[in-house]
UniProtKB/Swiss-Prot annotation:
Keyword vocabulary terms for this entry: Cell inner membrane, Cell membrane, Magnesium, Membrane, Transferase, Transmembrane, Transmembrane helix, Ubiquinone biosynthesis
Name the UniProt record assigns to this protein: 4-hydroxybenzoate octaprenyltransferase
GO biological process: ubiquinone biosynthetic process
GO molecular function (one): 4-hydroxybenzoate polyprenyltransferase activity
Length: 292
C-alpha cells in the first residue's frame, strides 16, 4: 500500500471519514478535557491552553476515526451500521486514509509544540493510544478500556500544561473518565453486538453478556463516586454539586433506556452521555469566576 495524494474533490468523503458531520465523539472528548483545564486552573485556564486543547481534541478525534476505519476496513462491510463508511464503499482509498491520518497528527503535534516540554512528552502517549485502540478489538475483550485511556489522555496533559504537575486529582479524574467511557461505549457496542459476534470482533458488550446493564451501572457508580471525591478534594462550589445531581439523573435515565437492549434505545442512551459531560462542565464553570 502506498500513500496517496489527497484530492480536493474527495473533501466530502474525508469529512465523513473524520466524522466531522457526527460531533458526538468530539464532545465526549472535549468535556473531560475542559473539566481538567478548569480543575487544574481553578476555573481560569489560559486562552492559549483553551484553544490548543480544543483544536487538539478535534483534530485527534478526527485522526482516531481515520485510523479506526482503516483498521476496520475489511470488517465494516459486515456490520449494518458501518457498511456505508467511505473506506468500505471505495470513496476513499487506504492510501488516502493513511495520508490524511499523517496530516492530522502532524497538525496536532505542531499545536502541542506550543505547550511545555513535559506536555509534549505526554502527547506521545496520546498518539500511541490513538493508533493502538482500533486494533484492540481483535485481541482483547476490553477494547473499551483502551478507548477510555485514549479519550482521557488529555486530562494529564491539561494538568501538566497548566501546573507542570500531575496531582492526585488528575489521576482520579483520569480513572473516573475511563469508568464513564467504558460504560457509555459498552452501550454503543450493544448496538453492534449481534454483528460483532458473527464476525468475531470483541467488546465489553459481548464480555458482559446478560450482566451488561448491571456492570454499566457499577461503572457509572464508580464514576460518580470519583467525581464526588474530586469535588470534595477541590472544595468546589454549589453549582458543581448541582451538575453532579443532574448527571446522576441522566445516568439513571440511560439505565431505563437500555432495559430492553433495543438497538435504537442503546444508541440513544450512548448519545445522552453528551449531556452528562455538559452537566459537569456547567457545574464547574459556575463554581469559579468567569475565565479569560
Amino acid at each position: 500500500m502506498k500513500l496517496a495524494r489527497l484530492t480536493p474533490s474527495h473533501i466530502p468523503y474525508y469529512i465523513a471519514l473524520m466524522r466531522i458531520d457526527k460531533p458526538i465523539g468530539t464532545l465526549l472528548l472535549l468535556w473531560p478535557t475542559y473539566w481538567a483545564l478548569w480543575l487544574a486552573n481553578a476555573g481560569m485556564p489560559s486562552l492559549t491552553n483553551f484553544i490548543v486543547f480544543t483544536l487538539g481534541v478535534v483534530i485527534m478525534r478526527s485522526a482516531g476515526c481515520v485510523i479506526n476505519d482503516f483498521a476496520d476496513r475489511k470488517i465494516d462491510g459486515s456490520v449494518k451500521r458501518t457498511m456505508q463508511r467511505p473506506l468500505v464503499s471505495g470513496q476513499v482509498s487506504s492510501g488516502e486514509a493513511i495520508s490524511l491520518f499523517i496530516l492530522l497528527i502532524t497538525v496536532a503535534f505542531l499545536l502541542v509544540l506550543m505547550l511545555s516540554v513535559n506536555t509534549i512528552l505526554l502527547s506521545f502517549g496520546a498518539l500511541a493510544l490513538a493508533f493502538c485502540y482500533p486494533f484492540m478489538k481483535r485481541y482483547t475483550q476490553l477494547p473499551q478500556v483502551v478507548l477510555g485511556a485514549a479519550f482521557g489522555w488529555a486530562i494529564p496533559m491539561a494538568f501538566m500544561a497548566s501546573i507542570n504537575a500531575l496531582p492526585i486529582q488528575a489521576w482520579l479524574l483520569f480513572i473516573a473518565n475511563i469508568c464513564w467511557t467504558v460504560a457509555y461505549d459498552t452501550m454503543y457496542a450493544m448496538v453492534d453486538r449481534d454483528d460483532d459476534l458473527k464476525i468475531g470482533v470483541k467488546s465489553t458488550a459481548i464480555l458482559f453478556g446478560k450482566y451488561d446493564r448491571h456492570i454499566i451501572g457499577l461503572l457509572n457508580l464508580a464514576f460518580i463516586a470519583l467525581m464526588l471525591s474530586i469535588g470534595a478534594l477541590n472544595n468546589i462550589g454549589l453549582s458543581y454539586w448541582l451538575g453532579l445531581s443532574v448527571a446522576i439523573v441522566l445516568l439513571v435515565y440511560q439505565q431505563v433506556l437500555i432495559q430492553q437492549r433495543a438497538r435504537t434505545d442503546c444508541f440513544k442512551a450512548f448519545l445522552n452521555n453528551h449531556y452528562v459531560g455538559l452537566a459537569f462542565f456547567i457545574g464547574l464553570l459556575f463554581s469559579y469566576p468567569v475565565a479569560f
